[in-house]
């Protein structure tokens, strides 16, 4: 009998080891997928017509069923290994092909030049070009036969606010549906001078993502803000950014080289976005990639932002280093030159050398073997001080570093002061004022200046995950209140927060100025303040995002689906880019 028990126990041990190994393998695969480059561009073609050999661009017609003529242009090498649309030379050839078609002339609202996704950076965008006999704007409305999908109306951003040349990317077509599109030419007096309706059958999404999300109404009766939510870093949809309207309908599927966008920065009628693990691109309003910034040995990690004039700053990993996710780099937007601004393992070396690599039985087991001792996840540049404020998930600390272009030095740190006691860095900790629990595992920290505050005071807004875990300093055990989560997955008794700190650099203090509760998410997530006062909050582990009113009450929440989590969801009206 004893022998049978021992054999049974041995079998259980083996099974546990197999399960653990399987979990580690799957987790490693998903995490690795974040950095992988797209190995193919799945494109359904129409009827082949000819190849422009001079620029090696293939021409097709009717790649989709439509009541108007729709063209398709593809680089001749699009099926070759290593091909990418995020190549300036490829984009210039496509632009030349498009210009050749435009030069034929004679395009009208009723017979426009229509090209499906001409630059390959989206799956359901329709490029339209035509001229009118009078100055106007083009307003369009998209409907489907599915009565549960509301109509979508927008004013297209053409070359001029009111002009006779109409050229734009039509955003809003629903994947997997026959779409009815009504174009209206509207003059300065608001009169509709002409209109035209056509139909177009759009294919299913390239990613396989559903064309709608489940929406749940909150208690607030406040109005939703205008714009599109854009979801980035859904764990089994790396290489895509999804744009949803206020009803949860997918209105645009952006195709990347890999990775995720992190955020979208507006630059007039262009945007900047991360498009690969080591690429940032500048993209025009019609989807053309105008410039690609190759980061060389650096891999992006979860945030980039504006630097001083003509510069971007980004969080990164130096792939030639033994550590990960602890570098701050700058990118010159004119030359593309990449400069290391801060190596945090050098800046904080006395603490860094006391840390260790992540183990397979730690909270962040999917990073086993990596030296992720700081795990930076958001950055904001403060130009007047040549400083940055960064968020460190691993230490649950917000860090301000000054003189980043000259001699970087720590200015202050905000978090649980006990964490830094005895490390030699306690001198930088600002003092917590008031009875509240400081942030743990925070993301998306933003500095907010307020003219009503005296000099030296400002607010910090953040998504406080309210989750404690540290996998690289195993000798430290914090004293935590029961309100702080330690479960990686959902815990019904724990909530996360949107926190506002009032920072007083003069007094060396911080206090909680305001907060509101949001669904618990141990990792990832973000909180964005919109111009009208509403908030967009993404809780990435339960995979929900919502819009909240100015008092922190939920207006509407959306459920998405991902194998692990969704990194960030933001919202923009994209006026000046896609829309007027």
What spans do the regions from the language model cover?
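N-terminal Sec-pathway targeting helices
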Residues: 1-15
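Membrane-interface motif at the C-terminal end of an N-terminal transmembrane signal
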Residues: 19-42
């Amino acid at each position: 009998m004893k022998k049978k028990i021992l054999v049974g126990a041995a079998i259980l041990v083996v099974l546990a080891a197999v399960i653990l190994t399987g979990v580690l393998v799957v987790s490693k695969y998903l995490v690795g997928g974040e950095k992988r480059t797209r190995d193919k561009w799945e494109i359904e073609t129409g009827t082949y017509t000819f190849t422009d050999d001079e620029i090696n661009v293939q021409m097709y017609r009717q790649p989709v069923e439509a009541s108007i003529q729709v063209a398709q242009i593809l680089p001749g090498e699009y099926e070759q290994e290593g091909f990418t649309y995020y190549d300036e030379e490829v984009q210039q050839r496509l632009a030349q092909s498009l210009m050749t078609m435009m030069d034929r002339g004679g395009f009208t609202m009723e017979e426009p030049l229509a090209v499906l996704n001409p630059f390959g950076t989206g799956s359901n965008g329709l490029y339209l070009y035509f001229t009118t006999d009078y100055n106007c704007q083009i307003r369009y409305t998209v409907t489907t036969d599915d009565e549960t999908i509301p109509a979508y109306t927008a004013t297209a951003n053409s070359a001029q606010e009111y002009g006779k040349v109409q050229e734009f990317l039509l955003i809003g077509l629903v994947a997997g549906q026959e779409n009815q599109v009504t174009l209206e030419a509207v003059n300065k007096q608001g009169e509709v001078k002409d209109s035209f309706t056509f139909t177009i059958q759009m294919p299913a999404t390239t990613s396989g993502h559903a064309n709608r999300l489940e929406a749940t109404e909150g208690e607030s009766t406040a109005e939703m803000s205008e714009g599109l939510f854009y979801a980035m870093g859904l764990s089994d949809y790396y290489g895509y950014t999804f744009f949803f309207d206020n009803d949860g309908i997918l209105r645009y599927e952006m195709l990347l080289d890999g990775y995720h966008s992190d955020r979208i920065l507006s630059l007039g009628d262009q945007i900047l976005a991360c498009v690969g693990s080591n690429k940032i691109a500048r993209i025009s309003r019609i989807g053309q990639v105008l410039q690609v910034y190759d980061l060389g040995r650096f891999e992006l990690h979860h945030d980039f932002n504006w630097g001083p004039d003509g510069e971007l700053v980004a969080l990164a990993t130096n792939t030639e280093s033994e550590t990960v996710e602890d570098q701050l780099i700058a990118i010159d937007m004119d030359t593309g030159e990449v400069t290391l601004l801060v190596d945090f393992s050098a800046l904080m070396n006395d603490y860094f050398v006391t840390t260790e690599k992540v183990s397979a039985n730690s909270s962040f087991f999917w990073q086993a073997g990596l030296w992720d001792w700081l795990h930076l996840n958001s950055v904001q540049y403060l130009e007047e001080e040549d400083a940055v404020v960064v968020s460190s998930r691993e230490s649950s600390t917000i860090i301000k570093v000054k003189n980043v272009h000259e001699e970087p030095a720590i200015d202050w740190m905000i978090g649980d002061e006990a964490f830094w006691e005895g490390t030699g860095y306690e001198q930088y900790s600002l003092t917590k004022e008031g009875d509240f629990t400081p942030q743990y595992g925070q993301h998306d920290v933003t500095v907010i200046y307020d003219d009503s505050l005296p000099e030296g005071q400002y607010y910090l807004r953040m998504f406080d995950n309210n989750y404690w875990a540290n996998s690289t300093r195993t000798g430290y055990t914090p004293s935590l209140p029961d309100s702080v989560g330690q479960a990686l997955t959902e815990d019904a008794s724990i909530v996360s927060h949107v926190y506002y700190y009032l920072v007083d650099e003069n007094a060396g203090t911080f206090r909680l100025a305001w907060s509101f509760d949001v669904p618990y998410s141990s990792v990832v997530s973000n909180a964005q303040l919109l111009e009208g006062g509403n908030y967009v909050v993404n809780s990435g582990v339960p995979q929900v995002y919502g819009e909240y009113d100015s008092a922190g009450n939920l207006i509407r929440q959306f459920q998405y689906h991902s194998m692990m989590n969704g990194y960030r969801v933001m919202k923009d009206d994209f006026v000046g880019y896609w829309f007027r």
